[in-house]
Amino acid sequence: MATQTVEGSSRSGSRRTSVGNLLKPLNSEYGKVAPGWGTTPLMGIAMALFAIFLSIILEIYNSSILLDGISMN
């Protein structure tokens, strides 16, 4: 028989652990969304600053920004 059920092997019950009890409050707000834009503008500013940082790093890597007194091999 291809499908066989062994008595007591089902994982239908959940186990309570101390780590789970500590993390449960973090998951209690699941599915709730704050009204309005929230922190979206702050995230946009952070993304823009990160893009500027990456472009500066890229320009330094490509030597398109000349750094006085630093020799690049």
Swiss-Prot record:
The chain crosses the membrane at residues 41-61. Belongs to the PsbH family. The keyword Repressor does not apply. This is Photosystem II reaction center protein H. The modification Phosphothreonine is found at T3, T5. Keywords: Chloroplast, Membrane, Phosphoprotein, Photosynthesis, Photosystem II, Plastid, Thylakoid, Transmembrane, Transmembrane helix. Phosphorylation is a light-dependent reaction catalyzed by a membrane-bound kinase; phosphorylation occurs on Thr residue(s) in the N-terminus of the protein. It comes from Morus indica. PSII is composed of 1 copy each of membrane proteins PsbA, PsbB, PsbC, PsbD, PsbE, PsbF, PsbH, PsbI, PsbJ, PsbK, PsbL, PsbM, PsbT, PsbX, PsbY, PsbZ, Psb30/Ycf12, at least 3 peripheral proteins of the oxygen-evolving complex and a large number of cofactors. It forms dimeric complexes. Residues 8-20 have a biased composition (Low complexity). One of the components of the core complex of photosystem II (PSII), required for its stability and/or assembly. PSII is a light-driven water:plastoquinone oxidoreductase that uses light energy to abstract electrons from H(2)O, generating O(2) and a proton gradient subsequently used for ATP formation. It consists of a core antenna complex that captures photons, and an electron transfer chain that converts photonic excitation into a charge separation. It is a single-pass membrane protein. Residues 1-20 are annotated as: Disordered. Its main location: plastid. GO terms for biological process: photosynthesis; protein stabilization. It is found in: Plastid, Chloroplast thylakoid membrane. It holds the Pfam family PsbH. GO terms for molecular function: phosphate ion binding. GO terms for cellular component: chloroplast thylakoid membrane; photosystem II.
